[in-house]
UniProtKB/Swiss-Prot annotation:
This is Small ribosomal subunit protein uS5. With S4 and S12 plays an important role in translational accuracy. Residues 161-191 are annotated as: Disordered. It comes from the Bacteria. It comes from Gluconobacter oxydans (strain 621H). The keyword rRNA-binding applies. Gene3D superfamilies: 3.30.160.20, 3.30.230.10.
Length: 191
């Protein structure tokens, strides 16, 4: 009897969706509900979905069968997708911090060639997001649900220089002090 090839690896199970979305199964747990006649078992799944171009979402689903729990989690993840601005399509624009419950996450932008240095559930989020270079550290909890929610809290704080400039009513060039052609350094500092 031939076995099907096992899916998995460091990022969990990965499937391509029809609409260019990649979903990663982060965790699956067997949970029990105690009823009069004994225990009723179900499965809880946690899934991360992303387009690898700056959009990512997560969802949890619970059902009596594993495939149904994964399907529910995937549907919820698609509905909760957020857009994260990326620098050069490979990393974040700046370092950020997020927390949820006891979970704290520090996410740092990294130079090209660094790779994804992140543990467990955070790695699945960054791979689905399309980030190639990032350093992330989880503090305070190892619970995958809280770790992912803290990671999303950090990613929601991320913004692009253009967005920051528009909030301040300036241009991105003004924000970074880029000189216009012909200006000397003294003219830039004197305003």
């Amino acid at each position: 009897m031939a076995r099907e090839p096992r899916e998995g690896g460091r990022g969990g199970r990965e499937r391509e969706q029809g609409d260019d979305l990649v979903d990663k199964l982060v965790t699956i747990n067997r949970v029990a509900k105690v009823v009069k006649g004994g225990r009723r078992f179900a499965f809880a799944a946690l899934v991360v979905v992303g387009d690898q171009k700056g959009r990512v979402g997560y969802g949890a689903g619970k059902a009596r069968e594993v495939p149904e729990a994964i399907r529910k989690a995937t549907e919820r993840a698609k509905r909760t997708m957020i857009r994260v601005p990326m620098k050069e399509g490979r990393t974040l624009h700046h370092d950020t911090f997020g927390h949820y419950g006891a979970g704290k996450v520090v996410v740092r932008a990294a130079e090209a060639g660094t790779g994804i240095i992140a543990g467990g559930p955070m790695r699945a989020v960054f791979e689905s997001l399309g980030v190639n270079d990032v350093v992330a550290k989880s503090l305070g909890t190892r619970n995958p649900h809280n770790m992912i929610k803290a990671t999303f809290a950090a990613l929601e704080k991320a913004s692009s220089p253009r967005h920051v400039a528009s909030r301040r009513g300036k241009k991105a060039a003004e924000l970074f002090g880029k000189r216009e052609q012909g200006q000397t350094e003294a003219e830039v500092t004197n305003g």
